[in-house]
Amino acid sequence: RCHEASTADNAASKMYAYDAGKAALEDFCRSRGWKVQISHSLHLGFYRITYMPDILAVRQDVGIVGGRILDRHNKITSGIYDEEGNRLYKGLHKEYSGGSTHRATLMQDCAAVDIRCMRLCEKMRPVFEEITGVPYIETGKMKLADVSGISCDEAGYGKLSMELGRAAREMGFLVVWDSRMTIKIN
């Protein structure tokens, strides 16, 4: 019982609803005083918020922002952790959205992000040094935390990541995962 204008057959036939959702997000962000750009994601009904100049400058409630780490096969190896320290989306190809809710592609609050792909607000930087034993220095185009002075295995990186996430939340900050922040390791 589908016809050409049916939303069951053609999701684009209700673009007015998706545009209204986008406008609602723009209004919400404007009411918070956040300078942002809202865009449709690849999946209609899901949106991308781009903070101007970046999330740490705009959102005073965010202490850490981090992204995904891909292996040589473009599969997620790490990036986002749940409360138990499990790495979410591990093994997913970078192009896979994570199912019907597309969580693997959406910015979201989380327990922790991987220390190898993170940025911190000013107030979290001394905590980084306290936990890791190395000073917080931003490096590269994405200005990620330089972890070259930290020598540990995968489990060690996970432990440090969880400690930083816990410390941020104890200080009242959010930890945000953004899949657009991506690095590749071999």
Predicted features by range, described:
Residues 3, 68, 121-123:
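Structured loops at beta-to-helix junctions and adjacent beta-edge loops in soluble globular domains
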Residues 6, 71-73, 126:
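Feature marks short, surface-exposed loop/turn motifs that line or immediately flank catalytic pockets
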Residues 53-87, 174, 181:
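Conserved donor NDP-sugar-binding/catalytic core segment of glycosyltransferases
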Residues 78-81, 95-99, 165:
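Glycine-centered structural positions embedded in regular secondary structure
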